[in-house]
């Protein structure tokens, strides 16, 4: 009887571990030498919708305003150092989330 209980606990533990591993898989987007997570692109869109930077800062700085947001995901920060940051971030924003989550878009990996 003790071995059945142990076997039952191990089975439950295995199922829990599988569910946790499945939840940690992420879809990555590779674009112009940068690799970012789809979740980061979703957060980028949300940050841009909520943040309005000062017009003076926009006039002085060639970087997109969102690059100065303290909550910008770490994997997007290297893009902000590029001279093409605005166009790269724009391209990432326009990638359809559904296409990446379904792995239709060739730039998306990790499905």
From Swiss-Prot:
Coiled coil: none annotated. It holds the Pfam family Guanylin. Residues 27-96 form a propeptide. The keyword Secreted applies. Residues 1-26 form the signal peptide. Its main location: secreted. InterPro entries: Guanylin, Guanylin_sf. One of its GO terms (molecular function) is guanylate cyclase activator activity. It comes from the Eukaryota. Keywords: Disulfide bond, Secreted, Signal. It is found in: Secreted. Disulfide bonds join 67-80, 100-108, 103-111. GO terms for cellular component: extracellular region. Belongs to the guanylin family. PANTHER family: GUANYLATE CYCLASE ACTIVATOR 2B (PTHR11318:SF4), GUANYLIN FAMILY MEMBER (PTHR11318). Endogenous activator of intestinal guanylate cyclase. It stimulates this enzyme through the same receptor binding region as the heat-stable enterotoxins. May be a potent physiological regulator of intestinal fluid and electrolyte transport. May be an autocrine/paracrine regulator of intestinal salt and water transport. This is Guanylate cyclase activator 2B. It comes from Cavia porcellus (Guinea pig).
